[in-house]
């Protein structure tokens, strides 16, 4: 419960502030770790990169959070 009380407000803040999809997607049973997945859709790749940069900064700015790693994948319609 303590973990959820930290993670839920962060996920809700990211969704509201940046209009992205965000959810806790990993390490669900590990007390001191989590994985938060974020996705964004836009016509312009540059805009998606800017939004994801801002989301990363925002998540890292929470004093109760230590960002251990970030993985990013940007997919374009040209990739299909």
Region locations from a protein language model:
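Short, charge-patterned binding micro-sites
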Residues: 22-44
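C-terminal structural segments of small proteins and small subunits
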Residues: 42-80
């Amino acid at each position: 419960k303590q973990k959820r009380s930290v993670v839920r407000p962060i996920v809700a803040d990211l969704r509201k502030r940046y209009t992205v999809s965000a959810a806790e997607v990993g390490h669900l049973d590990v007390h001191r770790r989590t994985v938060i997945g974020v996705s964004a859709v836009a016509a312009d790749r540059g805009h998606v990169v800017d939004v994801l940069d801002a989301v990363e900064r925002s998540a890292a700015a929470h004093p109760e959070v230590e960002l251990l790693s970030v993985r990013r994948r940007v997919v374009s319609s040209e990739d299909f």
